[in-house]
Amino acid sequence: MNRRNMLAITATLFTGLALAGKSAGAQQPADIEAVKAAHQSFYKALSARNAKAMEAVWANKAYVINIGPRSKTIAVGYADAVSQYWPKAFDALPKIAVTSTITQVQTDGKIAWVVGTEIANLQTKSGESLKLDIIVTNIFEKEGDRWLMVSHHALPIPK
């Protein structure tokens, strides 16, 4: 192979790589930061026990799901289940303090997922204090310029 052909192949390869990096599916730093902000908004609403703020975090779609660390069933659908889950949880737990650590954020520009851990300090109505170490996966969907939660799955780490 002569030098001219090698240069043409190299130029084609670099052009392809540059275009692939700018494709719609490539992760954009602005999307990553926006997903992290949406993720933190969820935890702010949770720790504040604020149903109105929680409503603003979720997509109002029939396919959203919520599995809390103490859930016995899967809440499917925003209007039918998820919107009702949070007021009940806030009523059952007069104290909620949750901190989140992000391990990974991934997005294709339309869907994003955040994997990490939570430490939940809870107090029940009866006064019982609970501390849960949790593995969490949160999935977000982009609607317009907002990232809205479509799935929250929190799994207690066995002791």
Regions found by a protein language model. Give the residues of each.
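Sequence/structural signature of outer-membrane beta-barrel proteins
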Residues: 121-123, 158-159
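Hydrophobic/aromatic beta-strand elements that line small-molecule binding cavities or substrate pockets
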Residues: 85-86, 100-105, 118-120, 135-141, ...
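Short beta-strand edge/turn micro-motifs at domain boundaries
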Residues: 113, 133-158
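Short, low-complexity N-terminal intrinsically disordered segments enriched in polar/charged residues
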Residues: 2-4, 8-60, 80
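Generic C-terminal helix-cap and adjacent flexible tail
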Residues: 28-29, 157-159
